[in-house]
Amino acid sequence: MENGMIHILDIPESDEKQEFGYLSSEREFSNCRIRVEFKWGAKRVVPNNENKRDSGLLYFFNGPDKIWPRALEFQVQETDVGDLWLLDGSRITTKIETEGLPMYVLSGPLKTQSRGRIIKFGDFEDRNGWNQLELVLDADKATHIVNGRVVMRAWDIQQPSKDDPTQYLPVSRGRIMLQAEGAEVWFRNLQMKPIKPTEKPWSAR
């Protein structure tokens, strides 16, 4: 912590390869709205010293602790803030373009995705200043919001059963985490609030 902010990569720059890591909650979260602001710093370390600055907000984190655990990722990466990554067997239903790389669209066919990256809608991030991220978790649905704009929605979130990995089960809760992936980043004003029964949890302009 530094001046009330979470400061990731507060270490000297080095030519030696550094391990990735994360900061995880102890409790599980469900049916809530999570807000946090982030801003990039200047430091980068090997192996990401020449790549886009990268971090992430992971949610519905279930299973053993490891890098890239069973979870979904609200991508925090230069030019890609709001992308969704499906990690370690997680799968969703969402609206995507039917040609080329999977890309979320506001109106389109529903399709089940079970691996890799889904590109966010639009580009609303500030490369040089503070950005506000909102993650809305509503039962087995999730919404990514960047600076007040909806960029990703997911329905029917599922993960493999612990007893039988070939069987998928609905997921509506899990831990959250912030990633450290070789780039300096500050997070501030982290808030987590329950969704009220009368609230429209997916509302944003």
What are the language-model segments listed below?
Residues 1-205:
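Carbohydrate-interacting regions of secretory-pathway proteins
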